[in-house]
Swiss-Prot record:
<dbReference type="GO" id="GO:0005886">
    <property type="term" value="C:plasma membrane"/>
</dbReference>
<dbReference type="InterPro" id="IPR011527">
    <property type="entry name" value="ABC1_TM_dom"/>
</dbReference>
<keyword id="KW-0813">Transport</keyword>
<keyword id="KW-1133">Transmembrane helix</keyword>
<dbReference type="InterPro" id="IPR011917">
    <property type="entry name" value="ABC_transpr_lipidA"/>
</dbReference>
<protein>
    <recommendedName>
        <fullName>ATP-dependent lipid A-core flippase</fullName>
        <ecNumber>7.5.2.6</ecNumber>
    </recommendedName>
</protein>
<dbReference type="GO" id="GO:0016887">
    <property type="term" value="F:ATP hydrolysis activity"/>
</dbReference>
<feature type="domain" description="ABC transporter">
    <location>
        <begin position="378"/>
        <end position="611"/>
    </location>
</feature>
<dbReference type="Pfam" id="PF00664">
    <property type="entry name" value="ABC_membrane"/>
</dbReference>
<dbReference type="GO" id="GO:0140359">
    <property type="term" value="F:ABC-type transporter activity"/>
</dbReference>
<dbReference type="Pfam" id="PF00005">
    <property type="entry name" value="ABC_tran"/>
</dbReference>
<dbReference type="InterPro" id="IPR036640">
    <property type="entry name" value="ABC1_TM_sf"/>
</dbReference>
<dbReference type="InterPro" id="IPR003439">
    <property type="entry name" value="ABC_transporter-like_ATP-bd"/>
</dbReference>
<feature type="transmembrane region" description="Helical">
    <location>
        <begin position="32"/>
        <end position="52"/>
    </location>
</feature>
<dbReference type="GO" id="GO:0005524">
    <property type="term" value="F:ATP binding"/>
</dbReference>
<comment type="function">
    <text>Involved in lipopolysaccharide (LPS) biosynthesis. Translocates lipid A-core from the inner to the outer leaflet of the inner membrane. Transmembrane domains (TMD) form a pore in the inner membrane and the ATP-binding domain (NBD) is responsible for energy generation.</text>
</comment>
<keyword id="KW-1278">Translocase</keyword>
Length: 621
């Protein structure tokens, strides 16, 4: 079907993704049919306005005529001919034509205007609703994607898929559908008028269609890769803007404005270069199509003048033919230029469908425990992030008792955070298995598994909302009293009292209105409100001053009461009271025991502790 609609410019393979997106349009088929009827009205009135010229010149300036002699023959054709004769006489033959002709013209223009407004409004409405539904499905898909996808895919690419490509695919589709249907109908109607007026001259007009089709095909093939590269460059630009916005402090602190500007300029120049190619092709396409149409028009005028001199045509028919041909020029030009936006539309649809087809996070679990006790075991666990064979965890084995506080220490890259990320399945093991209360976590439904954990990390993320909503994010059904208790437990009563809005004070983008310690304690309050049986702390007190660390540590102590806790620590002074300390290096456990036991061994932990004490002395000094 797409080959017929585009006169062979595009094949079924080009439009596969686009046709898939058209499933979103089906609920609005009644409105589309109504738009088609309105488009038909535009085409019909446009065509008749061209045919209007011949009787205007041939009959409009002549004396009133006698009533026509109607055919007495039976049949549909004779009846239609009689109606035509009667209508022509009513408009052109009576003395009243001095007001019926202008009135008839006004009625035609009003009908065309109403039909044009109706078709434009309905197609725009369908386009907006379709874009909304596709974006809703894309956002729902994004929520199901794995942590690995979010880590590996730049945010600019995701934004481009959800905003730019969706807009390009559906909005272009609406415009192209209108052009294909309306202008094709107009060209068809005007062609019928031309054939009616002078079939010999019409053949010349018809001959230019294949030439215009070949011209469009040439530019389509030339621009396919340029348009694709342009769309990718827009994604890169989105990513540069997002990174600069999110990392504005780093940019300012390291005087990186010039570097940021250079990155942006490089991408911007690429987009400009590609846009110039697209613009050049578009600009060159129009003059060539105009040249073909002008040659056809010149030939028509030459032959029509010859026919007029030899009495084969009337002045009215000649003028009507020229007007119809000139009216045909604009829709033919639109149809000839449609290959570039169609190419953009198909490539954008490919990008949207590729995003929708991204495999979701695997969830093959069938068990749904309500609340676990908190016993955790790692059995022969390997984790490989890269394909070079280097393991983040290597044959890792660990048992954690219910209610036990276990601290993981070691140098950077030793595998501490990987252990934490394995439990909620942000990372999947390459080998081995992990059990909670004797149940393999792969057999537990993801939502039920993650409901068992509360996480407080060094990279706190807060939403651009109120303090109340940020804390309540972990339990949307919680009331103000519960949220207030969680905040008080997290040592944030002073923050509540500092604003007349109290719980409902806005905290800014990612908590920009708060200090580092306050942001950390808001995350702790969120974890307190969730009341999960297992607590994961990933360097939750790093990069805090002594007073903030003291307040955060007090809040953490309250949070860890009667819970199994796994603590990743950088400052070793914060985990001296842990039930057990696991010392890691190169993805393996090399020492474990209490603080006193490990210090007495004078081993790797003692070395780390001495380094930590020196760092603390430097910070204090």
């Amino acid at each position: 079907m797409i080959e017929k609609l585009t006169f062979g410019l595009f094949k079924k393979e080009d439009a596969r993704s686009f046709m898939r997106l058209m499933a979103y349009v089906r609920p609005y088929k009644i409105r589309i049919v109504a738009a088609l009827i309105a488009i038909f009205g535009v085409a019909a009135t446009e065509s008749y306005l061209a045919a209007f010229i011949a009787p205007l010149i041939n009959h409009g300036f002549s004396a009133p005529a006698a009533p026509p002699e109607l055919s007495a023959a039976a049949g549909i054709i004779s009846t239609l001919q009689n109606w035509r004769e009667q209508f022509t006489y009513m408009v052109w033959g009576t003395e009243n034509k001095i007001w019926t002709v202008p009135l008839f013209l006004i009625i035609l223009v009003v009908i065309r205007g109403i039909c044009r407004f109706t078709s434009t409004y309905l197609m725009t409405w369908v386009s907006v609703m379709t874009i909304s539904k596709i974006r809703k499905d894309m956002f729902a898909k994004m929520l199901t994607l794995s942590s690995r996808y979010h880590q590996e895919t730049p945010s600019g690419t995701v934004l481009m898929n959800m905003l730019n490509l969706t807009e390009q695919s559906v909005s272009n589709a609406s415009d192209i559908f209108t052009v294909l249907t309306r202008d094709t109908m107009i060209v068809t109607g005007l062609t019928i008028v031309l054939l009616y007026l002078n079939w010999q001259l019409s053949l010349i007009v018809v001959l230019m269609f294949p030439l215009l089709s070949l011209l469009s095909r040439y530019y389509r093939d030339r621009l396919k890769h340029v348009i694709s590269d342009s769309q990718k460059s827009i994604g890169t630009m989105n990513n540069v803007i997002a990174e600069t916005h999110q990392g504005h402090r780093v940019v300012k602190l390291f005087n990186g404005q010039a570097q940021a500007a250079n990155r942006f300029d490089a991408v911007n120049r690429t987009i400009v270069r590609l846009s110039k190619k697209i613009t050049q092709a578009t600009a060159a396409h129009s003059p060539f199509s105009e040249l073909i149409a002008s040659i056809a028009l010149a030939v028509v005028i030459f032959i029509a003048l010859w026919q007029s001199q030899n009495g084969y045509t009337t002045i009215g028919e000649f003028m009507a033919f020229i007007v119809a041909m000139l009216q045909m020029y604009a829709p033919i030009k639109s149809l000839a230029n449609i290959s570039i936006p169609m190419q953009t539309m198909f490539l954008a649809a490919d990008g949207v469908c590729a995003f929708l087809d991204t495999p979701p996070e695997q969830d093959k679990g069938t068990l749904a425990p309500q609340r676990v006790e908190g016993r955790i075991s790692f059995r022969n666990v390997d984790v490989e992030y890269r394909s070079d064979g280097i393991k983040a965890l290597d044959n890792f084995n660990l048992d954690i008792r219910q209610g036990e506080r276990v601290a993981l220490v070691g140098r950077s890259g030793s595998g501490k955070s990987t252990v934490v990320n394995l439990l909620p399945r942000f990372v999947e093991p390459s080998a081995g298995n992990i059990c909670i209360d004797g149940i393999d976590i792969a057999d537990i439904k993801l939502d039920c598994l993650r409901a068992q954990f509360a996480l407080v990390s060094q990279d706190v993320f807060l939403f651009d909302d109120t303090l109340f909503e940020n804390v309540r994010y972990s339990r949307p059904d919680a009331g103000e009293a519960e949220v207030l208790f969680a905040l008080q437990t997290a040592n944030l009563q002073s923050l509540i009292d500092s604003s007349p809005l109290g719980l409902h004070q806005p905290i800014g983008s990612n908590g920009s209105n708060l200090s580092g310690g306050q942001r950390q304690r808001v995350a702790i309050a969120r974890a307190i409100l969730k009341d999960a049986p297992i607590l994961l702390l990933d360097e939750a007190t790093s990069a805090l001053d002594n007073e903030s660390e003291r307040l955060v540590q007090q809040a953490l102590e309250r949070l860890m009461e009667n819970r199994t806790g796994i603590i990743v620590a950088h400052r070793l002074t914060t985990i001296e009271g842990a039930d057990r300390i696991i010392v890691m290096d190169d993805g393996k456990i090399i020492e474990q025991g209490t603080h006193e036991q490990l210090m007495s061994q004078n081993g790797y932990y003692t070395m780390l502790r001495n380094i930590s004490n020196k760092d603390a002395a430097v910070r204090t000094a």
